[in-house]
């Protein structure tokens, strides 16, 4: 547990920001699943011995989403977007990557993130609560430009970058290791909409646009890793890395919508703590807490206890 904060308390705070619905994810409630593949580059195997990084093509399940807990949120509303990828390994197991349009988290701890959500609860005193929070968390003021960037409205799920917030330790076959952060970069040019243009769009235009785009061919993202430098924190997701060493380790190719998963009680969870041989989670407290919140959220919305299927904390 993180500093006395429980997963249920975190979920209550998340739902308190408005729009949450029973039976839906606490965040990123509105999303769509897609099928595709992943093929690693030759550079990947030099960085990690993970089985999906050996250069062979593996199946992938991809989910694009809006960040809100409101499953009916209009796609034209400003907000963080998410892209998650589940790689199926040769032995049938899976490993996950979770990324979003925000480059950094607003806090280095679960408690700090939840305190901000509590300050954002809709109500007459919201402006005062937010002002007080900003005054007592001066680092957040410096992050405001990045937050505005993260909340831009993309013209397509396929025209914006997504970033993993946490560090992972990649271990190569020769035993060498390094910490990395993940970035999913579209091969299409980045494109965003103005607020006025977005207001004229249909409520589900991002899903509709991607469906039309896929009719013309696959959508691709470069999977890049940023390798930590000596001064880059591996445990603070609110701290920007100074390292400019970035390596493309593969390509995610999205071929079409998924029609099999999340039907008839099937549950899909994209958990960044679900790693595999050659990849280890850092000691980032937010990363460690996330898997507990995911398990609690699954139980609340479905009644199912993930139990042994949940990654180790």
Swiss-Prot record:
Source species taxonomy: Bacteria, Bacillati, Actinomycetota, Actinomycetes, Mycobacteriales
Species annotation = Mycolicibacterium paratuberculosis (strain ATCC BAA-968 / K-10)
The record, for Pfam families, names: Catalase
Subunit organization? Monomer.
Family membership noted in the UniProt record: Belongs to the catalase family.
Q: Which UniProt keywords apply?
A: Heme, Iron, Metal-binding, Oxidoreductase, Peroxidase
Q: What class of enzyme is it?
A: oxidoreductase
UniProt-listed InterPro entries:
Catalase, Catalase_core, Catalase_sf, Catalase_SrpA-type_pred
Question: What Enzyme Commission number(s) appear in the record?
Answer: 1.11.1.-
Active site positions, chain numbering: 28
Q: Keyword check for Lipid metabolism, yes or no.
A: no
**Which cofactor does this sequence's record say it needs?**
heme
Q: What is this protein called?
A: Catalase-related peroxidase
Q: Which residues bind heme?
A: 294
One GO biological-process annotation of the entry reads: response to hydrogen peroxide
One of the entry's Gene Ontology molecular-function terms is:
heme binding
Cite a GO CC annotation. Answer: cytoplasm
Q: What is the purpose of this protein?
A: Has an organic peroxide-dependent peroxidase activity. Exhibits strong peroxidase activity using organic hydroperoxides as cosubstrates, weak peroxidase activity using hydrogen peroxide and negligible catalase activity. May have a role in elimination of reactive oxygen species, in particular by deactivating hydroperoxides.
Q: Which SUPFAM superfamilies match?
A: Heme-dependent catalase-like (SSF56634)
Q: Which residues form a coiled coil?
A: none
């Amino acid at each position: 547990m993180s500093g006395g904060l429980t997963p249920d308390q975190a979920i209550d705070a998340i739902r308190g920001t408005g729009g949450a619905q029973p039976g839906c994810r606490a965040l990123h409630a509105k999303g769509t699943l897609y099928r595709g593949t992943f093929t690693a580059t030759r550079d990947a195997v030099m960085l990690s011995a993970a089985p999906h990084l050996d250069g062979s093509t593996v199946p992938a399940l991809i989910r694009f989403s809006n960040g809100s807990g409101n499953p009916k949120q209009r796609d034209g509303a400003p907000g963080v977007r998410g892209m998650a990828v589940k790689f199926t390994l040769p032995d049938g197991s899976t490993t996950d990557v979770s990324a979003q349009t925000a480059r950094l988290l607003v806090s280095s701890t679960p408690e700090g993130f939840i305190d901000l959500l509590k300050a954002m609860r809709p109500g007459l005193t919201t402006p005062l609560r937010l002002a007080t929070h900003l005054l007592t968390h001066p680092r957040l003021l410096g992050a405001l430009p990045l937050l505005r960037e993260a909340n831009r409205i993309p013209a397509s799920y396929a025209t914006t970058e997504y970033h993993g917030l946490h560090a992972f330790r990649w271990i190569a076959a020769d035993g060498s290791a390094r910490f990395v952060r993940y970035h999913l970069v579209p091969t299409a040019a980045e494109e965003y909409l103005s607020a006025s243009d977005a207001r004229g769009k249909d409520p589900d235009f991002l899903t509709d646009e991607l469906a039309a785009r896929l009719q013309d061919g696959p959508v691709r993202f470069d999977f890049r890793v940023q390798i930590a430098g000596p001064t880059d924190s591996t445990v603070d997701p609110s701290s920007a890395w100074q390292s400019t060493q970035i390596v493309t380790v593969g390509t995610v190719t999205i071929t079409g919508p998924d029609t099999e998963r999340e039907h008839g009680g099937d549950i899909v969870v994209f958990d960044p703590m679900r790693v595999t041989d050659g990849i280890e989670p850092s000691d980032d407290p937010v990363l460690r807490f996330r898997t507990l919140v995911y398990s609690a959220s699954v139980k609340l919305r479905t009644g199912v206890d993930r139990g042994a299927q949940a990654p180790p904390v």
